[in-house]
């Protein structure tokens, strides 16, 4: 993880490209994994699509976060956004543990937290939208966080379905 106190945008293009390439390469493993585990291909394809979407959204979030200096400082000081990002990291970790242990229970607990976070972000957007002060990068960044939360919820549901098979 990077410190929020970075002065310059980190160079992550090659890392993001490698992540995206690796996500696309996983497509070739869907059919053998489906045959071996008897989990429908549609679940694996959904997980792979969401994985690819998350990597692309991460790249868009980075672009919005570093778009302009003033918007960067506004985003840096937004407590709700930081809390939501920490929660998303915790959700990803709980998904990893659920997959490792084969237990979908921790994933169910995350859905409610995620819905609360999305609602807080919606309120944040609505408050700024009424004031007509929102810059495009800030609005885009908050919206991308809401979409990331939605994608994580979909991923959680697919993983739960796979673990129940």
Feature roles, as predicted:
Residues 42, 50-54, 58-61:
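Structured inter-helical modules in multipass membrane proteins
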Residues 1-44, 62-165:
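Long, hydrophobic alpha-helical segments that serve as membrane-spanning/inserting helices
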């Amino acid at each position: 993880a990077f410190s929020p106190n970075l002065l310059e945008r980190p160079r992550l293009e090659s890392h993001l490209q490698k992540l995206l390439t690796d996500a696309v390469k996983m497509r070739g493993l869907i059919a053998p994994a489906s045959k071996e585990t008897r989990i429908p291909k549609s679940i694996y394809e959904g997980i792979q699509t969401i994985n690819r979407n998350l990597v692309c959204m991460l790249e868009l979030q980075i672009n919005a976060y570093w778009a302009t200096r003033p918007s960067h400082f506004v985003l840096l000081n937004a407590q709700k956004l930081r809390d939501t990002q920490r929660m998303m990291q915790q959700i990803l970790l709980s998904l990893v543990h659920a997959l490792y242990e084969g237990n979908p229970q921790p994933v169910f607990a995350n859905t409610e937290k995620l819905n609360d976070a999305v609602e807080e972000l919606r309120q944040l957007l609505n408050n700024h939208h009424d004031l007509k002060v929102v810059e495009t990068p800030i609005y885009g960044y908050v919206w991308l966080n809401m979409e990331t939360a939605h994608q994580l919820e979909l991923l959680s549901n697919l993983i739960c379905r796979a673990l129940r098979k």
